[in-house]
Amino acid sequence: LFIDRSGIPLAFCIHPGNTNEQTTLIPLEEQILRDFSLSKFIVCTDAGLSSERNRKFNNFGGRCFITTQSIKKLKKDLRQWCLEPTGWHLKDSLDTYDISRLEDTAKNRSRLFYKQLYVEGNDGKRDIDFDQTLIVTYSLKYRNYQQQIRNQQISRAMKAIDTEPKRIDKHSQNDYRRFIKKTSITADGECAANKIYEIDQDAVQEEAQYDGFYAVYTNLDDDPSEIAAVNQGRWEIEESFRIMKSEFEARPVYLKRDDRIKAHF
């Protein structure tokens, strides 16, 4: 779904549920270029659409991008730079901050700390520069929110260990059961007759280190805090999908032919 800055839908395309969404962005952009005769626009996407191929496509022809970047998937040196507690900034301030020393106060919870790193690159296919800025933000409010969600998931995981052991082994990437560790051997290395389930504290700590952090790649030269604010506006797309599923009752779809599925939406 493409929307403008006011949240008004511009274009919508439908794909089978098993389609890799990264491959859907460029064809839809090309359609918008034809239909709306747009010469310039800024594409703002979540991490699911943030492939290097898509970013390079939006690095020429008057197009720009702001795309979410998973910190976990960055190279080790960039990941360490993102999580480094020193060298953070605030909008309209010349000071630098150490986020490890922040007190959890109302004032600090309302602040958005950031830092940026210029990353040089090249688009060999088009023989042009592919330079990006990696912008990382840190928010105590976002950190507390992520901690709250994870604590709720850990509580569900503990309950599952006690009541639903047969369902523990099957889980998705963000499922609460990812925090459950299974042991099938004894301390002596022998096969155990029963599986032992417990909370995986290593997995909890690994995930907790990213609490409060958020990263984007962009080829814009604007103020980092302004770019972060634009990216946060993506919630309007999620809101549009919620409206379709609730008020518009767009799902479930009891149709099979592609033309009728499109007509339904």
Sequence positions of predicted segments:
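Anion-binding and metal-coordination hotspots
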Residues: 1-265
